[in-house]
Amino acid sequence: DSSDIERPERHAQPARHGTATNRRRYPLMMAAVLVATLIASFQHFVLTLPQATTGQIQFTDGIVVMTGGQQRLDDGVRLLTEGCADKMLISGVGKGVNRAILVQELGLSEAQINALFCCVELDHAAQDTFGNAKSTREWSHSHGMQSLRLVTANYHMPRALLIFSRELPNVDLYQWPVNPDDLDLSNWWWDPASLR
């Protein structure tokens, strides 16, 4: 009787096309994970940006404004005029730019013009954040400064603080993050200016 004969079980052989499909899916899945990680990381960066200081502002020996936008200069000059420091350095100023040009461009009040001419030094040497920090180190050491307020864009502040703290380990650094008017970080994924 053929029903009594034991037949060896057939083990299913893995389909070769399934393995090939998995090999093709793996890079796509890894790319998707990478893109999701990048988006999540950028979202975290945007949500943790320093915000403008409110309340009483602590006096510092100096103010350092890193060029890159008129709003930074406006804030720096205002802080100086309000007595938040005795001296200010504008670092990374373009060649040929002087105080008279700044007065024209910024539309300063008389008190701000007086502060600009008496208490502000222009640094034309710095080309980047590392250069800003080196110029600031020389400037602050020449004046015996122990505390500085950094004025730069909010998205630039974390990097600037890192570089400046390495260059000026014995100087207390305070931040003054500027929220650029033309940068909408609440809807950064829709705003082309935010993405650049």
Residue ranges of predicted features:
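N-terminal Lys/Arg-rich, disordered targeting/topogenic segments
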Residues: D1-R24
